[in-house]
């Protein structure tokens, strides 16, 4: 008769690659001792598309449609960083109206990104209802995007020196209505989630990061502010026209998954405040600085030359990048999104290095999940908020 014995060696479990609709195609190799996590190794690269190398073979205008595929849930921010770099290198002035439109679009995109973080995060820890609620509000934001840009996602709206089109008639009133409605929905979320005892049991004290670790790991965004550091690039760098608005940096000092949730909920309310102020104070004037459009050619072509024989050969505007280096950054929903740009006195960047917030924040995951339970992995991973498009690039 065979007597069954208890196995005492560690078990290695593959979590993932996850479905793209959740956290992206991330694979975790987890070493378990029963329910306890001994080690965790993230495996990246399933969504690598060579975005940095593609940038070296495209003009900025040609590259704009590519960048919306980094963080495909907050595409306005990747567009903003792509045009901000050449604008600063070339000392290009952005009209005031265009800057206000950009801020409105960025903050709407921030709310949409946080909403699509909140739903799957709650689903990860067992609450299904918020997952359906958040799509109700997110749909309204996408309706606004569609009215202004023509696209619900992958907007391709930002241009060097401004934006592609002006806001359509009646759009501002629609946006006002959305802001008033969304504030009531935020209150509903807080009643439903924030004091829920089951939710608190799953997130309070789970995945704690202290101030020293946050700085050493180079974390940013809600991960940084949830650990007691009031650092928001909208206040620090004053890019676009954020210094003209009255709003507060959202932060907590506990550093756990609950603190990160509270920071993001607070940020959605602050974004509404910024949008309302921008809608009230939006000035008139041009929406794009058309004077800085220059064509990279030595002479004007003749009417019978080869270039004019095909309509597809009509040249797009190209912007010559000076021979300089520049690091430009903005506060994306997930943290500091930066680009290190080297110009080479032509239309193509010599180097285009992306600093994605999700990739940096994901590094601390193995340390956070060690000595935790298996069920806590999804709670901690969800609270970090990653999108594999920008992690793998």
Swiss-Prot record:
Its EC number is 7.1.1.-. SUPFAM superfamilies: HydB/Nqo4-like. The keyword Heme does not apply. One of its GO terms (biological process) is photosynthesis, light reaction. GO terms for molecular function: NAD binding; oxidoreductase activity, acting on NAD(P)H, quinone or similar compound as acceptor; quinone binding. It is a peripheral membrane protein. The keyword Cytoplasm does not apply. Keywords: Chloroplast, Membrane, NAD, NADP, Plastid, Plastoquinone, Quinone, Thylakoid, Translocase, Transport. It is found in: Plastid, Chloroplast thylakoid membrane. One of its GO terms (cellular component) is chloroplast thylakoid membrane. It catalyses: a plastoquinone + NADH + (n+1) H(+)(in) = a plastoquinol + NAD(+) + n H(+)(out); a plastoquinone + NADPH + (n+1) H(+)(in) = a plastoquinol + NADP(+) + n H(+)(out). InterPro entries: NADH_Q_OxRdtase_suD, NADH_UbQ_OxRdtase_49kDa_CS, NDH1_su_D/H, NiFe-Hase_large. It comes from the Eukaryota. Belongs to the complex I 49 kDa subunit family. NCBIfam families: PRK06075.1, PRK07415.1. HAMAP family: NDH1_NuoD (MF_01358). NDH shuttles electrons from NAD(P)H:plastoquinone, via FMN and iron-sulfur (Fe-S) centers, to quinones in the photosynthetic chain and possibly in a chloroplast respiratory chain. The immediate electron acceptor for the enzyme in this species is believed to be plastoquinone. Couples the redox reaction to proton translocation, and thus conserves the redox energy in a proton gradient. NDH is composed of at least 16 different subunits, 5 of which are encoded in the nucleus. This is NAD(P)H-quinone oxidoreductase subunit H, chloroplastic. The lineage of its organism: Eukaryota, Viridiplantae, Streptophyta, Embryophyta, Tracheophyta.
């Amino acid at each position: 008769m065979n007597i069954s014995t208890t196995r005492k060696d560690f078990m290695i479990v593959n979590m993932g690659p996850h479905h793209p609709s959740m956290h992206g195609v991330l694979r975790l190799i987890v070493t378990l001792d029963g329910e306890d996590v001994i080690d965790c190794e993230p495996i990246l690269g399933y969504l690598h598309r060579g975005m940095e190398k593609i940038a070296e073979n495209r003009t900025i205008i040609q590259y704009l449609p590519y960048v919306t595929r980094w963080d495909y849930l907050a595409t306005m921010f990747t567009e903003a960083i792509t045009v901000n770099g050449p604008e600063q290198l070339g000392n290009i002035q952005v009209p005031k109206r265009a800057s206000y439109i950009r801020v409105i679009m960025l903050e709407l995109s921030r709310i949409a990104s946080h909403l699509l973080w909140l739903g799957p995060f709650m689903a990860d820890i067992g609450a299904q209802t918020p997952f359906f609620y958040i799509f109700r509000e997110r749909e309204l934001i996408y309706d606004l995007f569609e009215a202004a840009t023509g696209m619900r996602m992958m907007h391709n709206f930002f241009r060097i020196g401004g934006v592609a089109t002006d806001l359509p008639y009646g759009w501002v009133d629609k946006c006002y209505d959305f802001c008033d409605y969304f504030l009531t929905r935020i209150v509903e979320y807080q009643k439903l989630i924030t004091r829920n005892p089951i939710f608190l049991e799953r997130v309070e004290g789970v995945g704690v990061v202290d101030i020293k670790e946050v700085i050493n790991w180079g974390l940013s965004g809600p991960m940084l502010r949830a650990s007691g550091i009031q650092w928001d690039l909208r206040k620090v760098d004053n890019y676009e026209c954020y210094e003209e608005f009255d709003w507060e940096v959202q932060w907590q000092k506990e550093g756990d998954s609950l603190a990160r949730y509270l920071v993001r909920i607070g940020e959605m309310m602050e974004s509404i405040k910024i949008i309302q102020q921008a809608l009230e104070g939006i000035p008139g004037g041009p929406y794009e600085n058309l004077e800085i459009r220059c064509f990279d050619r030595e002479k004007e072509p003749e009417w019978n030359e080869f270039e004019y024989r095909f309509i597809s050969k009509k040249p797009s505007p190209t912007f010559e990048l000076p021979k300089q280096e520049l690091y430009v950054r903005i506060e994306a929903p997930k943290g500091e999104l930066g680009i290190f740009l080297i110009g080479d006195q032509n239309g193509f960047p010599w180097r285009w290095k992306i600093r994605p917030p999700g990739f940096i924040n994901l590094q601390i995951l193995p340390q956070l999940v060690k000595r935790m339970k298996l069920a806590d992995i999804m709670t901690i991973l969800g609270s970090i908020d990653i999108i594999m498009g920008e992690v793998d690039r």
